[in-house]
Every structure is written in C-alpha cells, then in structure tokens.
C-alpha cells in the first residue's frame, strides 16, 4: 500500500510540471494573441519584450508600457464508452496577466522589463469521479520576471535578452486509490502544497531587418528547473491500519523542469495598412524522461517515474489591418502539437493536439493610450487515450477513455507610450 501511495504522490508532481509546460498558457500580450500569439518579428508595442527582446531598440517612443489580463475558461469531458461512465470538469477561470515595459536609452540601446504568467492553470473534476485516484483538482501559478537589454549592432541587426527569475506555487488533491476510505466511508485523499518554488534561467534573441518591410526574429528561452524543497503533503481520511499511512503531514523535495523554447519567425509589412506574421516554436519536452521525489519520512523511499515526453512544435499565423487612424484589426490561427505520448495521457493535463483561432483589435483612445482586446478559441482534437503508469499492488491499472476539450480566452489590455 505504501509503495502504491508513493507512485500516486509522484504522479501529482508529474502533473504539476505538465501544467507548467504542456498546458502552457499562451497569453503574454493581447496584440500578439489576436494574431495567433505570433510576435517574434512584430514590433508594435512593449509586448516585444517577451516575444523578442532584441526588438525593443526598434520601438519609436522613449517609454512604452503594455499590460493586460486574460480569462481562461476551459472545459474537459471524459467518457468510458465501455462502462458508460462520464465526467466533466467544473467551470472555473484562470487569469494570466502580463506587464511589459521598454525604455529607449538612445538609438542603440534599450532597457526593458517583462513580468508574465506563462505557466499557470487549474482543473477541477467532479468529486470522487472515476479518475479521482489520479486527480481531483490542481492549481498552479508561476511568475516570470525578466530584466532585459536590447542592443542595435547595425541598422539591420540587433541582439537582446537577459536573466529570468521564476517563482511559483502548486496545490494538488487526489484520492489515495480507487476504493480506500476511512471508517466513516470518507475517501482517503492526499493534498500536496508548496509555495515559493523558484529558480532562474535566461533568454537570448536577435532581429534582422534586411529591408524596412521585413523583420526576421529569433528567440530562445532556457530550460528552468523549479526546486520544491520542504513542501507539505497532507494525508487525510486514511483508516487506522498498519498497512496505510497515518493521517498527518510529511515533507518532500522535488525538481520540476520547465522545457526550453526556441522561436523563429518573421513579420512582413507590405504597406502602412497590412502586416503578416509567422512564428515557428519548438518546445524541448524530452527533458521529461522521469521525475524523482525524495520524501522527508525516512521510511518512504525516493521514487522515480518515467514520463517519456517528446519534443513538440507550434505553428502560428497572424495578420493585422489598420482600418482607420483609431482602429486596428487582427486575426490569427495556430496549431499546437501535444508532447504527450501513447500510454501517458493523464486527466491532470487532458490535452491533445490543439487548434487555436484568434481575433482582436486595438482602439487608439489618444495619442498616448490604446486599448487592446483579443479572443482565443482553443479546441483540442478528440482523443481515445489512456494513462498506463498507475499501479495497485505492483500491477499496472490503466485509466482510459475519450476526452473532448476546449477553452475560451477573452483578454483586455492597454498600451501606453511617451
């Protein structure tokens, strides 16, 4: 029983790390999001600080700020067609935000700051549903803070980047098994909680402008290892038995890797009214070979759990049209490959390949202030899949079914310049 619970605890952290990457929230700027979240070659606001910091030096104004928030409304339905069992996630909203600022020191150097929440989400299933031994609910938040510098080496080429400081927290609850209860019939469950999980990384980028109508961009964001040390694991509603853990708390240490990302793309502006953008993004998911957890209780051995993820790509397309002096319209699309391989599809992160459809606009309130709005409809392809790494009494007990998922993301922001 204790070995089984260790595997379950390990699954908790595997799911948390997936939410920090595999279910990455692409909402780091309303203007970019409205164009399929393509932005590595687009210089139209301080959002460039996140997408390609080397482009900050091309902003025309002395000081530019972009800030906003997006609502994430997701829905997942699961069904076992053999048994007829059905479950659906509870409606909730995530609220990723961003704050970008760029300051032009002179014509050759700009400084910037980017504060974002690219990894943060939540899922809440119905209480004691068929997969409650894998997850009841999860909440994760991670904040990226990036001081940046952009240097123009010539009229056609610039570089940029800086360190990344990350801090976050995670809370996860699951039932201990498919059937275990205490003497009163309450399902035995485990809650894991940790705050202040942190570490550092870096980003580097360049922008090449061969002609004034075309910008080619490259951005690399490093792998970041989030170190959870002394986190709290709470065991609740366990029966009074020598074969099960006692109710109470223990500590744990774990390292949660966030994969590196590489983005390359371009923006083409044939005239003053139109702009077209394309980004290719590669996330290096193969860092998730396994995940190790060391427990504070000396009677509980360290566990190793294989994840076997694969690298995945995202293809982003966007367009912008300046309709009037005050209104700019945008639209886009992206295709997002899932890094999850067969046999590793868990309900903590129920995502398959996804298609994102986006639109939005900017309204110029005054010479200095603009309001930016975007909307994303994200639909994941229906999939029949299973999670095969759950163990009971040393035996694999696959959890399988059909998943249907989608998400709506309306967003609002402002751009201010001096």
Model-identified regions with their sequence ranges:
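Outer-membrane beta-barrel pore proteins
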Residues: 40-62, 101-105, 153
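Asp/Glu-centered strand-loop micro-motifs enriched in Gly/Pro and often flanked by an aromatic residue
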Residues: 38-40, 44-45, 85-89
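Outer-membrane beta-barrel porins/channels
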Residues: 21-33, 61, 78-88, 93-418
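Sec/Tat signal peptide C-region and signal peptidase I cleavage site
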Residues: 16-20
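Transmembrane beta-strand segments of Gram-negative outer membrane beta-barrel proteins
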Residues: 24-39, 57-75
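Bacterial N-terminal signal peptides
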Residues: 7-15
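Hydrophobic alpha-helical membrane context
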Residues: 14-15, 64, 384
């Amino acid at each position: 029983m204790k070995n089984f619970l260790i595997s379950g605890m390990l699954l908790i952290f595997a799911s948390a790390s997936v939410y920090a990457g595999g279910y990455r929230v692409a909402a780091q700027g309303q203007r970019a999001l409205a164009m399929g979240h393509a932005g590595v070659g687009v210089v139209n606001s301080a959002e460039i600080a996140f997408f390609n910091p080397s482009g900050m030096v091309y902003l025309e104004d002395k000081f530019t700020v972009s800030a906003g928030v997006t609502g994430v409304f997701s829905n997942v339905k699961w069904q076992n067609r053999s048994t007829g069992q059905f479950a659906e996630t509870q409606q909730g909203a995530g609220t990723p935000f961003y704050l970008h600022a760029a300051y032009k020191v002179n014509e050759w150097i700009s400084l910037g700051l980017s504060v974002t929440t690219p990894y943060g989400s939540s899922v809440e299933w119905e209480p004691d549903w068929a997969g409650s031994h894998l997850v009841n609910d999860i909440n994760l938040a991670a904040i990226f803070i990036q001081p940046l510098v952009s240097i123009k080496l010539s009229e056609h080429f610039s570089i940029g980047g800086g360190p990344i400081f990350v801090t976050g927290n995670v809370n996860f609850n699951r039932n201990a098994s498919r059937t275990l209860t205490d003497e009163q019939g309450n399902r035995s469950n485990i809650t894991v909680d940790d705050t202040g999980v942190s570490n550092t990384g870096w980003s580097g980028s360049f922008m090449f402008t061969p002609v004034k109508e075309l910008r080619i961009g490259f951005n690399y964001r490093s792998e970041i290892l989030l170190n959870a040390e002394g986190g709290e694991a709470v065991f609740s509603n366990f029966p009074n038995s020598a074969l099960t853990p006692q109710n109470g708390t223990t500590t744990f240490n774990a390292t949660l890797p966030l994969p590196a990302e590489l983005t390359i793309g371009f923006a083409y502006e044939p005239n003053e009214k139109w702009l077209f953008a394309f980004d290719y993004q590669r996330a290096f998911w193969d860092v998730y070979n396994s995940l190790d957890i060391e427990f504070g209780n000396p009677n509980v051995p360290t566990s190793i759990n294989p994840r076997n993820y694969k690298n995945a790509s995202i293809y982003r397309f966007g367009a912008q049209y300046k309709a009037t002096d005050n209104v700019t319209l945008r639209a886009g699309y992206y295709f997002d490959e899932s890094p999850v391989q067969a046999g590793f599809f868990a309900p903590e992160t129920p995502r398959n390949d996804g298609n994102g459809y986006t639109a939005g606009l900017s309204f110029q309130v005054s010479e200095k202030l603009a309001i930016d709005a975007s909307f994303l409809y994200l639909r994941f392809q229906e999939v029949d899949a299973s999670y095969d790494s759950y163990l009971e009494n040393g035996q694999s007990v696959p959890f399988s079914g059909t998943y249907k998922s989608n998400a709506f993301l309306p967003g609002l922001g402002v751009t201010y310049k001096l």
